[in-house]
């Protein structure tokens, strides 16, 4: 198949290489022209994926029309808060027979839409059969080195999710299929907020008990909100829910956990973000998740406290105490 990846960050580059090695004709689009030229020349992505060679046959371009035209699949690897602006530049006539696969993990601010909902909102002519997502515990740093990984491809149309499953499957990258596209997206997005909370626990030098509590109660509130929004409960116990939450809360590769850790150690959010090359999706998602919780009248105490720490400058120690001294509940 002819497949383009929009977004040459670590994950976009990793998936481009994986798909190329799987026998597909792959184009990788980078929005900065100078960086696209650098990638083409050096055949490494030293900022976002150092040490990994990009095959010479893999096409790298800054031209969006070239990347989009006459492709079977467009992989959308642009951060969630910037994806709409990229999609807005695409004419439906160029993608009327193309599957759009989102691999971003976030909820759009203001609209409170998942990426699949935003795609349909931005391009009304899109059929739901053309929209899919890929999510799960999958750090680019490991997938690019062929470390065994399992993820989920989801679409409302089973044939679409099956096509993505077949396109991406390798001996080291196992893909399951699902039709619960909403649940897969919500799990992948909301867990980033919980991972910031887990990082705060690390940075504040609390223990394993505290972190385990944040993670398990985090799954509980993610599931509550997801179910209220119409997702399936079993999705949150799977790879895109529990699986992704575990790896994002625990891994040294996790940008969201890193942000939380730095805040727990006393640093300010603006200084942390300024020092990072890559995007920590959970920062902005904490806004959207808090608003969705209010909209659907669902209690999400961890998400609420993470939001207050990030945007209302609440002391992490005070936030932890407030969580621990809430009214008694049954599990």
Residue ranges and their predicted role:
Residues 9, 13, 33, 61, ...:
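Electropositive phosphate-/nucleotide-binding environments in soluble metabolic enzymes
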Residues 1-52, 62:
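NAD(P)+-binding Rossmann beta1-loop-alpha1 motif at the extreme N-terminus of oxidoreductases
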Residues 82, 93, 118, 122-130, ...:
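Internal alpha-helical scaffold of NAD(P)-dependent oxidoreductase catalytic cores
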Residues 198, 227-237, 241-331:
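NAD(P)-dependent Rossmann-like dehydrogenase/reductase catalytic/cofactor-binding core
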């Amino acid at each position: 198949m002819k497949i383009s990846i929009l977004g040459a960050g670590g994950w976009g580059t990793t998936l481009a290489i994986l798909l190329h090695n799987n026998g597909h004709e792959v184009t990788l689009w980078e929005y900065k022209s100078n960086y696209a030229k650098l990638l083409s020349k050096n055949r490494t992505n030293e900022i976002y994926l150092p040490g990994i060679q990009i095959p010479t046959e893999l096409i790298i371009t800054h031209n969006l029309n070239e990347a989009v035209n006459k492709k079977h699949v467009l992989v959308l690897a642009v951060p969630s808060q910037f994806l709409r602006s990229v999609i807005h530049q695409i004419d439906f006539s160029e993608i009327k027979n193309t599957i759009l696969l989102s691999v971003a993990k976030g909820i759009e601010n203001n609209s409170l839409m998942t990426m699949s909902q935003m795609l349909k909102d931005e391009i009304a002519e899109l059929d739901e059969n053309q929209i899919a997502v890929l999510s799960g515990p999958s750090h680019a740093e490991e997938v690019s080195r062929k470390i065994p990984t399992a993820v989920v491809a989801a679409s409302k149309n089973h044939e679409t999710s099956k096509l993505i499953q077949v396109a991406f499957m390798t001996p080291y990258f196992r893909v399951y299929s699902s039709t619960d596209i909403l649940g897969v997206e919500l799990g992948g997005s909301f867990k980033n907020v919980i991972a910031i909370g887990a990082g705060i626990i690390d940075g504040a030098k609390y223990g394993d008990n505290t972190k385990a509590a944040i993670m398990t109660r985090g799954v509980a509130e993610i599931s509550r909100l997801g179910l209220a929004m119409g997702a399936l409960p079993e999705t949150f116990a799977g790879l895109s829910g529990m699986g992704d939450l575990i790896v994002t809360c625990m891994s040294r590769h996790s940008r969201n956990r890193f942000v939380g850790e730095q805040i727990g150690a006393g640093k300010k959010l603006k200084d942390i973000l300024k020092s990072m090359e890559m995007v920590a999706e959970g920062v902005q998602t904490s806004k959207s998740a808090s608003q969705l919780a209010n909209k659907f009248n669902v209690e999400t105490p961890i998400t609420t406290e993470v939001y207050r720490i990030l945007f209302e400058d609440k002391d992490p120690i005070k936030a932890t105490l407030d969580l621990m001294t809430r009214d008694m509940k049954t599990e």
